[in-house]
Amino acid sequence: MGVSGSKGQKLFVSVLQRLLSERGLHVKESSAIEFYQFLIKVSPWFPEEGGLNLQDWKRVGREMKKYAAEHGTDSIPKQAYPIWLQLREILTEQSDLVLLSAEAKSVTEEELEEGLTGLLSASSQEKTYGTRGTAYAEIDTEVDKLSEHIYDEPYEEKEKADKNEEKDHVRKVKKIVQRKENSEHKRKEKDQKAFLATDWNNDDLSPEDWDDLEEQAAHYHDDDELILPVKRKVDKKKPLALRRKPLPPVGFAGAMAEAREKGDLTFTFPVVFMGESDDDDTPVWEPLPLKTLKELQSAVRTMGPSAPYTLQVVDMVASQWLTPSDWHQTARATLSPGDYVLWRTEYEEKSKETVQKTAGKRKGKVSLDMLLGTGQFLSPSSQIKLSKDVLKDVTTNAVLAWRAIPPPGVKKTVLAGLKQGNEESYETFISRLEEAVYRMMPRGEGSDILIKQLAWENANSLCQDLIRPMRKTGTMQDYIRACLDASPAVVQGMAYAAAMRGQKYSTFVKQTYGGGKGGQGSEGPVCFSCGKTGHIKRDCKEEKGSKRAPPGLCPRCKKGYHWKSECKSKFDKDGNPLPPLETNAENSKNLVKGQSPSPTQKGDKGKDSGLNPEAPPFTIHDLPRGTPGSAGLDLSSQKDLILSLEDGVSLVPTLVKGTLPEGTTGLIIGRSSNYKKGLEVLPGVIDSDFQGEIKVMVKAAKNAVIIHKGERIAQLLLLPYLKLPNPIIKEERGSEGFGSTSHVHWVQEISDSRPMLHISLNGRRFLGLLDTGADKTCIAGRDWPANWPIHQTESSLQGLGMACGVARSSQPLRWQHEDKSGIIHPFVIPTLPFTLWGRDIMKEIKVRLMTDSPDDSQDLMIGAIESNLFADQISWKSDQPVWLNQWPLKQEKLQALQQLVTEQLQLGHLEESNSPWNTPVFVIKKKSGKWRLLQDLRAVNATMHDMGALQPGLPSPVAVPKGWEIIIIDLQDCFFNIKLHPEDCKRFAFSVPSPNFKRPYQRFQWKVLPQGMKNSPTLCQKFVDKAILTVRDKYQDSYIVHYMDDILLAHPSRSIVDEILTSMIQALNKHGLVVSTEKIQKYDNLKYLGTHIQGDAVSYQKLQIRTDKLRTLNDFQKLLGNINWIRPFLKLTTGELKPLFEILNGDSNPISIRKLTPEACKALQLVNERLSIARVKRLDLSRPWSLCILKTEYTPTACLWQNGVLEWIHLPHISPKVITPYDIFCTQLIIKGRHRSKELFSKDPDYIVVPYTKVQFDLLLQEKEDWPISLLGFLGEVHFHLPKDPLLTFTLQTAIIFPHMTSTTPLEKGIVIFTDGSANGRSVTYIQGREPIIKENTQNTAQQAEIVAVITAFEEVSQSFNLYTDSKYVTGLFPEIETATLSPRTKIYTELRHLQRLIHKRQEKFYIGHIRGHTGLPGPLAQGNAYADSLTRILTALESAQESHALHHQNAAALRFQFHITREQAREIVKLCPNCPDWGHAPQLGVNPRGLKPRVLWQMDVTHVSEFGKLKYVHVTVDTYSHFTFATARTGEATKDVLQHLAQSFAYMGFPQKIKTDNAPAYVSRSIQEFLARWKISHVTGIPYNPQGQAIVERTHQNIKAQLNKLQKAGKYYTPHHLLAHALFVLNHVNMDNQGHTAAERHWGPISADPKPMVMWKDLLAGSWKGPDVLITAGRGYACVFPQDAETPIWVPDRFIRPFTERKEATPTPGTAEKTPPRDEKDQQKSPEDESSPHQREDGLATSAGVNLRSGGGS
């Protein structure tokens, strides 16, 4: 249902009564409420997660049955079963419809009509769909399975029954109809009476009911039984149906139609207004098309709720008038439970916002109940009466809520922010976590894993310490059990306990809280006898099996038989007193820190240390050595100790006393094994004359560490002692102070007054007592801030008295005192009279105590607080000295240098130096006539690390609170009063030269901060800041500003600011800084950092812009830099300064000449005018302030405003983007203004005023991501009207700042225009109904061409138009370009500016749309774009040839004839191809008979192409006349492969008269011979093992392989067949001969009728020349002639033929013919191109194929 509480109850009761009343049944409201309350008790999940559907309702029934079994039937209300059964019958109707529909599909329409005539005519006006039963027994599992089966199996997916099944179904239907016809009337009456006459005090079924129930249940598994609808009572008062049909459709749509006829409008929507006008609209519910709902559900399931298509379907649904109930039903039916919860939440939030926004406009006519469908509008019948405005708001909110659903896979960071608070109990945190997780995902293994992971990750630090050991193995119950009493004391105590038991911390936690595989205590209890887990002491077998014998005579008293440890005697048997009995730590019950009940160490006591424990103290000579080769002597602890991280450094006694052996000194170092257990030993030096006890300084490196008595913890290394003649402070060290040589400190004597000290904790000052006896700092309860968290501890304060109820800070605090700071974790004691500073903080601030007594119990030396009056030490990149020789100086400058050095020596700023560093110095003369000393420190600056700027900007006096008194002081010679660190002085040495080298150079080095050192400003700022820190802490309510050597003091009271001045001067003098008393300014008319403070107004000091020296780029750059510096005080917009900024464009040379333009002169005059009136105000902290965005020309301007301007904020002149919309400039100003407000006042402005209307602002938030980002985290208000002040009225005269001419959707009556442009500079504008406009400019880029085309459209068409382009760049310009500022740096600035002006001149709107190019789709838009695109192409013939060759790799002749290029160009293309020249072959000259026309003689063979794998056997057939080739790749070369190849060849090439092959077995087989005989094809074979007879096909093999290699290198082919087909295509249809004919043309084209040439030829057999005869064909190496007296042609080598030229002389006789000389060398060396086909030579692949030189026939 999704609703709980009283609303859920009202909703359920209303729905229940309505459903039952529609069936003629009535139930009292009290009975319905009682049933609902019982329902919540049985099924608490139902109000929130359940719904009125069959699945949930049956789950309720099962839980009712389970509840009755556990609590008895008397615990169930009497009316529960009847109500549940009736409601289940209603919900089951849909199942019956599905079943009936499935059965009806197998029955013919005539048979179904005949079989159901009686049933349908019985009550034609009361047709409803019923249920299968009404008894409680139908809740059983079998019925559930049947119902689920019916729902899970859609009837559309059932197969149609065959004819026999159809007959069976007809028989079944007839049989059932007959049965139902007889009992229907009786069943109807019985069904109604059963509910109306129900005895509410008796829920037992009557015998008749049980019989009927058993009969119905028996039919559930009967194949012959078909459940038909049960007729129900219909309320006669319902209005008649609007439409009547003879037979309603079967299925869900039919059920809805039937329900509407009966007046049931629960599932009928949307609302349709039937009136003709708004006044007489009558709302009527109409059905939403079921197809639409199915489409929506399918889209959500397949593509997600936020997919574009899904949102389109939602918009289609939203086009109807839907009520809140309709939307909830639609969302619940189509969305997942998690998405539905998100949608419902968002819908409620949007509805609340709508009510708030429209409260004033509609005067409360729209309530939240209307929008949510709650309260009096809970029922659908009441929602139908809602007005159109309300329904529109409902639809708007529903769609917005739908769009807010995140896409699949996008996880919100809700769970990441759900963390346990410091004071929150762990179980409360887990409860919140489970609630959040279960809302996002259903319960199950996945949610449990997520909860467990987050229960660890998001827990606080204390709980994580307890969970960490069992994180992987523990359960959630283990986590909760461990964190029940989580506190720092518990964690520390467990660490102590683990250490005392010798266990790991993780093991101890697992034993205590569980976490193993077995849950809590999976390892079992721990035995106190043997220490093992799994049993207790009484069950210990080791104890029982190892009982020691009875004790003998006591060795202590010698008087009785008992153990020594149990001896209680005070005197021995002789009466002598006995020493006290030593008590082991194990038996001690009063354990304190430092006494650990540790288990016994390996060996006896003292054995591990090697010392005799009965004879302390020890000397150095008693210490043991680990091995003969050990370098150190072992030091052991002589007491049990437990250390924690908070204890810091502790001293461990060793009972070993000095002195060391003569001539040695000692070095104490730790043992490596100690580091493994977390014990860190601090190294120490033992002086040779030290006589006291040697102690070891240790500290814990992890939670807790235990040190057992006798355990070796350190080594003492004895080293040779070299005594030097250094000064001696004391004669002998003796036993005083453990450590090395003493220090010299300032001494403060102890007086009667308490030693109190101020220390800051987290920025808050505390006054406390220095207590050397306090281990830890303790804060008095009265001093502790109430809002600082603390937690109680189990420890108590022990001293002279005891303090209980000790608390401790829940978080570490940062302390600070002067220049020292650190972290402490103090205790908080309510009863302390004042705060105690313990040793944990005194040792950090260097507090020491000096005493002459050698018997101090504390080995400490405590003295006064150290001071440091040096600047911080500089960090250097290298220690390599830098030496630059001093250059010579003139006499005047040399004398000035010597005088200045003398003065600085007297002032203590310089000292003599022997430094290896040296850099030059020089002097300059100031205007006053005085000289100034400077040092060239560039080389030194390069060797130091940059310390950075501590104050990146100037402080503004605007932030000084309004009305406060102000004093400004200035420090005199600040750099020279700050001392350099002694280690750095040597690096700033210099030399004073001597003329003519009369004396050695005098060398000096600076002791103070030198001018020219890059880190001097930073060091100065840090030093002064430390000096005034005490004044800041003392006067925290004052306002103190420090920048370099200027300090501003402010306070509301004049007397207090004077007091601050006195304290400030004292603090500065204490650090050696001097205040210039003559420069102290007080109260009013003050000058500070270039500004003038007069009252509450701040102005810039008077300036005058000079124009007489503005000549170069550098001059103008400085001028504009100064103007920008003072612009925060000036009302100067960027548009007003634009003429000045434009002067900077052009040559980047700094000395390039620039001139003032008239516009720039006006801008400078405006600057001077604004300087004279520039004023800003100081801030009033008690009032809010605003950030106002002002709409000014070119770019917007902003100001911080509080009844006046606090500061002006401007944007740069040039934007980094080419096109920046005006609204984006506004977001940049918002970000910059908020940042500036936080810089000045540490707070966001209270209001932001934007130059847009509310509607425009909302649209910008939705459409532009920059706006939400600019307002991220802003908690104030956004306003849309500027303050009414004359200062801001200039912004009212402004240009367009919001696009209004660009339409976001296509215009209905707009002219259609297509534009395109290409990189060749051609732009095309195709206006529908006109001739295309083509413009060419070879200088244009593709972007420029695209923009030119768009500009042409704007120039040609003034009406509304829809422009389409395939350029993303062009569509991206709109609508921003309408209000954008254009950057002049772009090359297309002129075109963009022209386009912008055309837009501003337009009177009609336009639309710019993007369309994908080269899609080949049908339709006018795609075709129009394709047409425009085709007009932009200008491909040269050479480019086309290159593209074609890159694809096909054809020969040069084909390129020449196809693209009409020269022979040289074609050859050059082939030559430059990286794949073609590699495959040239030299032809073999010879004669090979071939056909004289196509399809006469073929040659066939098989070649192997290994790259084809299993298809490597390539069968090749070539026509010897046309050279037309066909090949197939096959898996073998057997007879079947040859037959299949021949069949395909015939289909591809026709069939020949003769085929020539070699003597391969497949070719000479009987099958081949029979096959060729049937086709009447002659078959001949060549000479065995002589391939020359097959020369043509062999050459074809090479051609095919060469073409395959070319294509394979140039492209990607998926199969061998694909590659082979492309190669055949090139050889047959692309390559050409010298006459421009392809092989296909020669093979299929007509044979030329041109006359054959006559030649003379030599008969090789007769050795004589004959002729003239007809030359049939000729080629490289061969010729075919047809003698006039012969019957067949004769083939001869081509060198034995001569062209016949008809002469007057007679034909030469044979004798003379023999003497005819052979062709000259020139003929013999003719180019192959002159004799062979181009497709065989020009690409380097010459073959033996020839060309019919005259007729164009084959070769």
Swiss-Prot record:
Lipidation residue positions, type N-myristoyl glycine: 2
Zinc finger (Integrase-type): 1436-1477
Residues noted as binding Zn(2+) in the record, renumbered to the chain: 1445, 1449, 1473, 1476
Domain Peptidase A2 span(s) in chain numbering: 766-841
Record field: catalytic activity: DNA(n) + a 2'-deoxyribonucleoside 5'-triphosphate = DNA(n+1) + diphosphate; Endonucleolytic cleavage to 5'-phosphomonoester; dUTP + H2O = dUMP + diphosphate + H(+)
UniProt key word Iron-sulfur: no
Positions bound to Mg(2+) 2: 1316, 1346, 1366, 1429
UniProt GO molecular function: aspartic-type endopeptidase activity; DNA binding; DNA-directed DNA polymerase activity; dUTP diphosphatase activity; nucleotide binding; RNA stem-loop binding; RNA-directed DNA polymerase activity; RNA-DNA hybrid ribonuclease activity
Renumbered zinc finger spans (CCHC-type): 525-542, 552-569
Region of interest: Disordered: 154-193, 572-631, 1699-1755
Entry binding sites for Mg(2+) 3: 1501, 1558, 1594
Cofactor(s) listed: Mg(2+)
Annotated GO CC locations: viral nucleocapsid
GO biological process: DNA integration; DNA recombination; establishment of integrated proviral latency; proteolysis; symbiont entry into host cell; viral genome integration into host DNA; viral translational frameshifting
Lineage top rank: taxon: Viruses
Binding site for Mg(2+) 1: 970, 1045-1046
UniProt KW keywords: Aspartyl protease, Capsid protein, DNA integration, DNA recombination, DNA-binding, DNA-directed DNA polymerase, Endonuclease, Hydrolase, Lipoprotein, Magnesium, Metal-binding, Multifunctional enzyme, Myristate, Nuclease, Nucleotide-binding, Nucleotidyltransferase, Phosphoprotein, Protease, Repeat, RNA-binding, RNA-directed DNA polymerase, Transferase, Viral genome integration, Viral matrix protein, Viral nucleoprotein, Virion, Virus entry into host cell, Zinc, Zinc-finger
List of catalytic residues: 771
Keyword Zinc appears in the UniProt entry: yes
Segments of skewed composition (Basic and acidic residues): 154-169, 178-193, 1716-1740
E.C. no: 3.6.1.23, 3.4.23.-, 2.7.7.49, 2.7.7.7
Cofactor: how and how many bound: The RT polymerase active site binds 2 magnesium ions.
Reported function: Nucleocapsid protein p14: Binds strongly to viral nucleic acids and promote their aggregation. Also destabilizes the nucleic acids duplexes via highly structured zinc-binding motifs.
Protein name (record): Gag-Pro-Pol polyprotein
Originating species: Mouse mammary tumor virus (strain C3H) (MMTV)
